[in-house]
């Protein structure tokens, strides 16, 4: 199991936890919209670090983005496995062709 898979499992396990006991549970309790908002905030922070060129800070912000992506997905009951299946289906397909095929 990869670090990302373990993190996804932890996020999933926190879905029913007491919001006072876990940051993840607290975010999930606020609903999908708040989870999406937080993901967007973290994505913007990663973009800023990418523009600045600070590799260490970009890596840190990218980790935050991945975590908040998993929380946002969990809030809508979308699993990491579902996302990975989509990526696997796209593997080996030109990005241009894949996008055109979406219709």
From Swiss-Prot:
<comment type="similarity">
    <text>Belongs to the PRA-PH family.</text>
</comment>
<protein>
    <recommendedName>
        <fullName>Phosphoribosyl-ATP pyrophosphatase</fullName>
        <ecNumber>3.6.1.31</ecNumber>
    </recommendedName>
</protein>
<dbReference type="GO" id="GO:0000105">
    <property type="term" value="P:L-histidine biosynthetic process"/>
</dbReference>
<dbReference type="InterPro" id="IPR021130">
    <property type="entry name" value="PRib-ATP_PPHydrolase-like"/>
</dbReference>
<keyword id="KW-0547">Nucleotide-binding</keyword>
<comment type="pathway">
    <text>Amino-acid biosynthesis; L-histidine biosynthesis; L-histidine from 5-phospho-alpha-D-ribose 1-diphosphate: step 2/9.</text>
</comment>
<dbReference type="InterPro" id="IPR008179">
    <property type="entry name" value="HisE"/>
</dbReference>
<keyword id="KW-0067">ATP-binding</keyword>
<keyword id="KW-0028">Amino-acid biosynthesis</keyword>
<dbReference type="GO" id="GO:0005737">
    <property type="term" value="C:cytoplasm"/>
</dbReference>
<keyword id="KW-0963">Cytoplasm</keyword>
<keyword id="KW-0378">Hydrolase</keyword>
<dbReference type="GO" id="GO:0004636">
    <property type="term" value="F:phosphoribosyl-ATP diphosphatase activity"/>
</dbReference>
<dbReference type="GO" id="GO:0005524">
    <property type="term" value="F:ATP binding"/>
</dbReference>
<keyword id="KW-0368">Histidine biosynthesis</keyword>
<dbReference type="Pfam" id="PF01503">
    <property type="entry name" value="PRA-PH"/>
</dbReference>
């Amino acid at each position: 199991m990869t670090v990302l898979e373990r993190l996804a499992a932890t996020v999933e396990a926190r879905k029913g936890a007491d919001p006072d006991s876990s940051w993840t549970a607290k975010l999930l309790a606020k609903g999908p919209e708040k989870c999406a908002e937080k993901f967007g905030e973290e994505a913007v922070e990663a973009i800023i670090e990418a523009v600045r060129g600070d590799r260490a800070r970009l890596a840190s912000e990218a980790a935050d983005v991945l975590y908040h992506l998993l929380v946002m997905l969990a809030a809508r009951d979308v699993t990491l496995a579902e996302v990975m299946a989509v990526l696997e289906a796209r593997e080996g397909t030109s990005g241009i062709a894949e996008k055109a095929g979406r219709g």
